[in-house]
Amino acid sequence: MRAVFIQGAEEHPAAFCYQVNGSCPRTVHTLGIQLVIYLACAAGMLIIVLGNLFVAFAVSYFKALHTPTNFLLLSLALADMFLGLLVLPLSTIRSVESCWFFGDFLCRLHTYLDPLFCLTSIFHLCFISIDRHCAICDPLLYPSKFTVRVALRYILAGWGVPAAYTSLFLYTDVVETRLSQWLEEMPCVGSCQLLLNKFWGWLNFPLFFVPCLIMISLYVKIFVVATRQAQQITTLSKNLAGAAKHDRKAAKTLGIAVGIYLLCWLPFTIDTMVDSLLHFITPPLVFDIFIWFAYFNSACNPIIYVFSYQWFRKALKLTLSQKVFSPQTRTVDLYQE
């Protein structure tokens, strides 16, 4: 995999990004279409940044939210927020203008940060599924099994593995020496796109489907446990009935998360594998649509995992009412009905 950029090329005023042989053709949109696309992308980035920023703030500020599960949510929110802040602005301009105007250094940096934040988000979704599975299917041992230290290990793995993987395919000599074998297969030069040969294209497959299979299998088990509890709810005490209701809600939330995860990432992952075999035949517009579908998952995460919980609504209300500036607010029990 390699980010390709021709530095020092002059921009062609009509049909090409740069005045060199093999330069990317520039798609010229009308001003109205450009405005619509920019506004849509800006709205998406705003949701991603503000939604995840508030998740990070709420978990950090309110002491009642300092739990292993919420620390995973905090780390997930940071990954998605950084994606919206550092990656998507440049991706928006590249998608609308169909050209890269920011030089070789930013091309490399953007190419590194994009998969880093996306993979980190995917890994955290998988770890949150594991956490919810332990909490629902093994509630008695959960407090001792999933501690803050365990959560921090998951967070370290969730950032460390994607960082190592992304560094491997961008900055190792192995990739550089094999680049000449398939560099000519790239669609054009000067586009700052990730180019995947067959090996890297198919390596992306388990990075998507392994977390997906883990989440699906855990969801099925959680759903079975929650359904069994619902059938026995008439014989349960009030407290246990409340716990069963909470478990069913967790199962529903996880099911929605898995479904949206598949919807957002499946088109891009399949296209990446197929494209590496068929000499990069995917039109740039179609590729942009697929990758923005994947980006959209980062906007859904705070809605799926947090907006449906009462503690988040209470935290949001306290913040908007400016009561958050009171010293006593930090110790408020957000879980109290």
Curated annotation (Swiss-Prot):
Topology feature Cytoplasmic, residues: 56-70, 131-154, 226-253, 308-337
Record PROSITE patterns: G_PROTEIN_RECEP_F1_1, G_PROTEIN_RECEP_F1_2
A biological process term (GO) from this entry: G protein-coupled receptor signaling pathway
Cystine connections: 24-188, 99-192
SMART domains, A to Z: 7TM_GPCR_Srsx (SM01381)
Membrane topology of the entry: Multi-pass membrane protein
Spans traversing the lipid bilayer: 35-55, 71-91, 110-130, 155-175, 205-225, 254-274, 285-307
Stated name of the protein: Trace amine-associated receptor 5
Organism of derivation: Pan troglodytes (Chimpanzee)
Record gene name: TAAR5
